[in-house]
Amino acid sequence: MMLVNIRYYKPLHKAYAGNAFTYRTAMPLTVGDKVMAPTKGGDKRAMVVEINVPESRVDERIMPLL
């Protein structure tokens, strides 16, 4: 398992932009991979922007939710 940061696709900008969001995954992802990431509004297009994110960089209040 590893932590990755993703950015969601923004149709208005026709780009993957905005804040990075952290997810835990067992998939062998690399930077630049395009994925479908779960959100409360359903799965959304996203791009992996960072892999192997250290737990120390994730807010401790969020870690149990990942």
Predicted segment positions?
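Terminal, basic amphipathic appendages of nucleotide-handling enzymes
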Residues: M2-L66
